[in-house]
Each structure stands twice: as structure tokens, then as C-alpha cells.
């Protein structure tokens, strides 16, 4: 199906002024897409670093009424609302030469529309390739807060052969934090993504079904919010009781 679509695009290029294609991986080197071999990869170009998200300036210019409404609904100040949105949905960087912060547009728009902080991006559907890397994540989950990847690997077309770091970067779970020479430092862009990844791997870490974990999490949050520390510890012990020691 993809080959046919891209073959049509190439055959009719005289009628096309601009074509923008986005996804989680660069595919110009993959034989399946050889029918469309005249692409320009703009993934890391500084002039396009903010093309797929929402910037601080765009929030100020376009979303202040929605931000103010969200502040009123939740009893927050305007600054508190902005800071919470930034913590949850901001933090993406797409070019070492233009490290402008970019918000996840899907999550930000949904949050402002509903006046709630929720994991909107995660609930839109986790990638089916994620379980392939569960074993690596069990051992190195905390390392993804700050991990490194070589420059010529980060743009590799085969995400399944580049390790968990490459896949998590290209699928949006990690972003560029800084660059030193030929090494990219990657990390979680924001709180929404951090929580989403941890929830994805929690069933494997605890050897429990997702439904069981959600029930125990709800109990844990309720006890913590009410200050019932002993009850919270009982739930926590139950949650991790079957987990491996290593």
C-alpha cells in the first residue's frame, strides 16, 4: 500500500508544490519506499525545529483565553497554569542548532480544551513495537532520564536495530537535551511522557496485569492523598511483591 501511494506522489510531482510526510523514522533508505527517492530529510534542520509543535510564542499569541479559563477552573494563577502545562507537555527539541522548546500539540490543545492535566498523548495509543524493548527498559529504565546516542545512529532508518534509545527517541518518548561533539544526550521531554513510559513497562516489572496495576495504583493514590501511610505501604508492598530482585 505504501509503495503504491508514494509511487503516485512521484509520478504526479508536476502537480505538487509541497509535500510533507511525517512518521517515527526516516525511510528514504528502506527498499519498500524506493519508489519515492527524491525526499529532503528536514528532521534535524534548525529552520524546521518547531514545525511539528507549539512554541511559547504561539501560546502567548493564540491560547491566552484558554489558558486563563483553565486557571479559573482549577483555582490556579496564570503563571501556575503555564508552569504546569510546561512541565507536562513542553520540552521537545528537534535540532542541535535550534533548541527551542516545543509543546506536544495534541496534548496541549486537549488540555486547554478540557482545562485538565491528563496523559492525552499516551491514551491516544501506545506503539505496538514498545514491548520489543521491555527487557532493556527493565534494567535501564532510570537511565533514560539521561542517556547518550551517537550522531550517526540517531537518524538511522531501522529503529528496531538501533536499541531502545533510538526507538524511544524516534517514537517521541525521548528528546534531545544537549549535544557534545558527536554525542547526543537524550532524556524525557516532559512529565506526560515519563509517566506514559513507566506505565507501559510496569506490568513487566511487577509481573501483574495492567488492570490489576491500575486498581492498586488507585488505592495507593487514595491512601497517600488522605495521609494513610500505613495503608499506602501495604498497597505498595502488594504492588511490588512479585517483582524480580534483579
Model-derived features: positions:
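Phosphate-binding site recognition
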Residues: 1-246
Amino acid at each position: 500500500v505504501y509503495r503504491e501511494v508514494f509511487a503516485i506522489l512521484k509520478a504526479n510531482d508536476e502537480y505538487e508544490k509541497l509535500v510533507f510526510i511525517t512518521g517515527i523514522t526516516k525511510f528514504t533508505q528502506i527498499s519498500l519506499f524506493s519508489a519515492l527517492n527524491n525526499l529532503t530529510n528536514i528532521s534535524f534542520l534548525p529552520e524546521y525545529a518547531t514545525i511539528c509543535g507549539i512554541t511559547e510564542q504561539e501560546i502567548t499569541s493564540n491560547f491566552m483565553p484558554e489558558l486563563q479559563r483553565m486557571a479559573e477552573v482549577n483555582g490556579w494563577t496564570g503563571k501556575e497554569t503555564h508552569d504546569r502545562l510546561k512541565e507536562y507537555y513542553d520540552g521537545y527539541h528537534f535540532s542541535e542548532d535550534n533548541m527551542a522548546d516545543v509543546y506536544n500539540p495534541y496534548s496541549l490543545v486537549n488540555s486547554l480544551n478540557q482545562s485538565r492535566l491528563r496523559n492525552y498523548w499516551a491514551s491516544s495509543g501506545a506503539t505496538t513495537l514498545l514491548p520489543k524493548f521491555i527487557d532493556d527498559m527493565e534494567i535501564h529504565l532510570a537511565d533514560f532520564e539521561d542517556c547518550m546516542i551517537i550522531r550517526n545512529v540517531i537518524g538511522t532508518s531501522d529503529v528496531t536495530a538501533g536499541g531502545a534509545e533510538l526507538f524511544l527517541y524516534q517514537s517521541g518518548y525521548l528528546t534531545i537535551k544537549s549535544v557534545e561533539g558527536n554525542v547526543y544526550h537524550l532524556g524525557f521531554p516532559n512529565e506526560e511522557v515519563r509517566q506514559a513510559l513507566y506505565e507501559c513497562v510496569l506490568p513487566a516489572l511487577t509481573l501483574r496485569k495492567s488492570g490489576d496495576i491500575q486498581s492498586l495504583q488507585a488505592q495507593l493514590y487514595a491512601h497517600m492523598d488522605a495521609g494513610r501511610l500505613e495503608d499506602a505501604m501495604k498497597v505498595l508492598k502488594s504492588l511490588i511483591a512479585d517483582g524480580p530482585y534483579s
